[in-house]
Amino acid sequence: MSLNFLDFEQPIAELEAKIDSLTAVSRQDEKLDINIDEEVHRLREKSVELTRKIFADLGAWQIAQLARHPQRPYTLDYVRLAFDEFDELAGDRAYADDKAIVGGIARLDGRPVMIIGHQKGRETKEKIRRNFGMPAPEGYRKALRLMEMAERFNMPIITFIDTPGAYPGVGAEERGQSEAIARNLREMSRLKVPVICTVIGEGGSGGALAIGVGDKVNMLQYSTYSVISPEGCASILWKSADKAPLAAEAMGIIAPRLKELKLIDSVIPEPLGGAHRNPEAMAQSLKTQLLADLADLDVLSKDDLLNRRYQRLMSYGYA
């Protein structure tokens, strides 16, 4: 897969282009007198070193760009790489099947779990079909239906958050977007099974929270979680979306800051260069964290689970 490089990664992109060019020449003419392999090896080491240097000092705006990277793994990628026997379930049993939310039963290390997550889509047709990962009310009602099913069958719930926000269209509002989100918040706080939520890309406002109330909340290293996008915040405060980098720094949208505020439990490290560079390694790290979280929650009784979740919610904010 050819990598897409972001603006701040251009020095890395230039090195990788040289590597690709030399590799292509080597394949075309194996009788060259110069030792291309040594030069390719040297450039690859230099690329890794440069990547480490750049990624050691990323700002919030750069992390926001990584969270939106078009090649970043989505929910169904992690389902394929970290789970077994996934059976997708569709529809809210009231209006429609919203493709921006995917869900179903799978096995995590042999254990049945319910998976629910946002799905953005990659190619143009799929992006449109999945509404760019922005759910309508029927998507959140589908998610709630699956959560209630998981509770009936005593299955843990695992959610993956990756959305710019709930769909703000007229039709969505007419069908009760705010009610659907609010109902999910209330019902998720009452579920009598373990709920583990992980932000894998963008955690955009109420659209993220509607599947984000859990006993454990994790974030991938280069994901974001916020009440509004940096561009939206900048447009309100400075009347210009060009101030988005400044807004991103001020908003505290990145995982280390949110962990410091005790809004999340864990930051899951990503492979060098981001999750899209090595989805398999990222999926394995995610799986390890999910299994550890389940082990922590399995020892709690249902009453203790609910009480712990209530105390968690009540602890949010400044005293």
Curated annotation (Swiss-Prot):
GO cellular component: acetyl-CoA carboxylase complex
Pathway: Lipid metabolism; malonyl-CoA biosynthesis; malonyl-CoA from acetyl-CoA: step 1/1
Superkingdom classification of source: Bacteria
Localization terms from the record: Cytoplasm
Single annotated GO MF: carboxyl- or carbamoyltransferase activity
InterPro entries linked to this entry: Acetyl_CoA_COase_a_su, ClpP/crotonase-like_dom_sf, COA_CT_C
Occurrences of domain CoA carboxyltransferase C-terminal (ranges): 35-296
Known EC number: 2.1.3.15
Enzyme class: transferase
Biological processes, Gene Ontology terms: fatty acid biosynthetic process; malonyl-CoA biosynthetic process
Gene3D superfamilies registered for this protein in UniProt: 2-enoyl-CoA Hydratase, Chain A, domain 1 (3.90.226.10)
Catalytic activity, as annotated: N(6)-carboxybiotinyl-L-lysyl-[protein] + acetyl-CoA = N(6)-biotinyl-L-lysyl-[protein] + malonyl-CoA
Keywords linked to the UniProt accession: ATP-binding, Cytoplasm, Fatty acid biosynthesis, Fatty acid metabolism, Lipid biosynthesis, Lipid metabolism, Nucleotide-binding, Transferase
Main location: cytoplasm
Pfam families, sorted: ACCA (PF03255)
Assembly: Acetyl-CoA carboxylase is a heterohexamer composed of biotin carboxyl carrier protein (AccB), biotin carboxylase (AccC) and two subunits each of ACCase subunit alpha (AccA) and ACCase subunit beta (AccD).
Role played: Component of the acetyl coenzyme A carboxylase (ACC) complex. First, biotin carboxylase catalyzes the carboxylation of biotin on its carrier protein (BCCP) and then the CO(2) group is transferred by the carboxyltransferase to acetyl-CoA to form malonyl-CoA.
NCBIfam families documented for this protein: accA, AccA_sub, PRK05724.1
Family recorded in the similarity comment: Belongs to the AccA family.
Name of the protein in question: Acetyl-coenzyme A carboxylase carboxyl transferase subunit alpha
Organism: Cronobacter sakazakii (strain ATCC BAA-894) (Enterobacter sakazakii)
Originating gene: accA
